[in-house]
UniProtKB/Swiss-Prot annotation:
It comes from the Bacteria. This is Putative pyruvate, phosphate dikinase regulatory protein. It comes from Rhizobium etli (strain ATCC 51251 / DSM 11541 / JCM 21823 / NBRC 15573 / CFN 42). Keywords: Kinase, Nucleotide-binding, Serine/threonine-protein kinase, Transferase. The lineage of its organism: Bacteria, Pseudomonadati, Pseudomonadota, Alphaproteobacteria, Hyphomicrobiales. HAMAP family: PDRP. Belongs to the pyruvate, phosphate/water dikinase regulatory protein family. PDRP subfamily.
Length: 273
């Protein structure tokens, strides 16, 4: 019998760096060996304007929603919209805060990011997170020389979650999709400061993740082309040729966790440690 991994969308919404939430989500998902989350991480969500696109992304790719949002109005909006979408939502901190309030006999201050010491390291992480979110999926290409790391790769090679993981460690990270036959931005080729690294995986792995992506989204896809193994092999071949031409390192993420991939990237540039 085929031992097939089932993928699901895990949406993680935080009003701070998201580290607490990511740890909780991974601890829970690790208990289910046959299922693997496709993580969508949304840090620094602190107002309605920032939250609305996140809710749309959840509607496009339904799954499980975990959040650490102390603002009651935003938390209520998440819960209401998730009910409308038929999606499970969990306020991870609320049961803990309620237990503290009952035991201590005092209400919480509900201060955003209260668990973080406001030191230079914290502000560096916030700056890196802002940079990384602004430069996700090829956005703002003129700023690539301000990045510490630029991650490239074809679709479904964990570029965004790896970028956010690095940003949580104060590393400014941009990521760019490699699209077969489409040249990379000139601003990337001209960049001299950042470490540029390409993420790859096996054809079977990418096809499987893409199939689950298509099944779990309402967006329009040319499913046959997107998940076709021959097409993916050509995309990987194209990515490898770009890296060979420019001397960029490749990291195979097939059997690596996000943490292991990030560690492999940092190992390529010791000054990032």
């Amino acid at each position: 019998m085929e031992n097939r991994t089932n993928f699901f969308h895990l949406h993680l919404i935080s009003d701070s760096t998201g580290e607490t939430l990511i740890s909780a989500g991974r601890a829970a998902s690790a208990q289910f060996r046959s299922a693997q989350p496709i993580e969508h991480v949304y840090p620094l969500i602190r107002n309605r304007k920032q939250l609305l696109p996140v809710l749309q992304a959840i509607d496009d790719a339904p799954g499980i929603v975990l959040y650490t949002i102390v603002d009651r109005e935003l938390a209520n909006l998440i819960d209401e919209r998730c009910v409308e979408m038929g999606v499970a939502s969990v306020n991870v901190l609320e049961p803990v805060m309620n237990a503290f309030q009952i035991y201590l006999g005092a209400p919480s201050r509900r201060r955003v990011g209260a668990q973080h010491v406001m030191n230079a390291g914290y502000f560096a992480r916030i700056e890196a997170l802002n940079f990384t979110m602004d430069h996700d999926d090829g956005q703002m290409p003129d700023d690539y020389n301000d990045a510490d790391v630029v991650i490239i790769g074809i679709s479904r090679t964990s570029k965004t979650p790896t970028s956010i993981y690095l940003a949580n460690r104060g590393i400014k990270t941009a990521n760019i999709p490699i699209v077969y036959g489409v040249p990379l931005p000139e601003s990337l080729l001209a960049a001299t400061k950042p470490l540029i690294v390409c993420l790859i995986a096996t054809t079977d792995r990418i096809s499987q993740v893409r199939e689950n992506r298509v099944l779990g989204t309402t967006q329009g896809f040319d499913r046959e082309h997107y998940t076709d193994r021959a097409t993916i092999s050509e995309e990987l071949k194209y990515a490898r040729s770009l890296c060979a031409r420019h001397g960029w390192p490749l990291i195979d993420v097939t059997r690596r966790s996000i943490e292991e991939t990030a560690a492999a990237i940092v190992a390529l540039r010791p000054k990032l440690r």
